[in-house]
Amino acid sequence: MSDPDHLHILWTNADPVTAEKMVFMYAANALKFEWWKRVTIIIWGSTATLTAENASIRSQVKEMLAGGVEFSACKACADELGVTAPLEELGVEVIYWGEPLTRLLRENCTMLSV
């Protein structure tokens, strides 16, 4: 069932500036200022590699996890890119996202795609 207070951010753009100045900034502030009650960032494609390998991105993900932002990565992508273990060690949930994403879209859940 769709939760009108839960924002999902589908993060596919692996540019670090986009990550820091859009995805992360909005997600963190959305919880801080209570624009949304829940925020989940879905790591998809090359953003899995960026998250696993970029020290600054990893640090920011840790901070946001501690602040309540949820992170979940596409397992198929992470497996193919060889970064499943580093993502899990960071505290990121790693699951197959094809069906859940389809369900979110069919239920018209609030989703921001970057």
Feature-to-residue mapping (PLM):
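Short, basic, glycine/proline-bearing loop/turn elements
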Residues: 43-47, 86
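A short aromatic-anchored loop/beta-hairpin motif
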Residues: 63-64, 72, 88-103, 109
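Short, glycine-rich nucleotide/cofactor-binding loops
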Residues: 8-23, 46-52
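Histidine-anchored nucleotide/phosphate-binding helix
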Residues: 20-33
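A glycine-rich helix N-cap at a beta->alpha junction
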Residues: 55-84
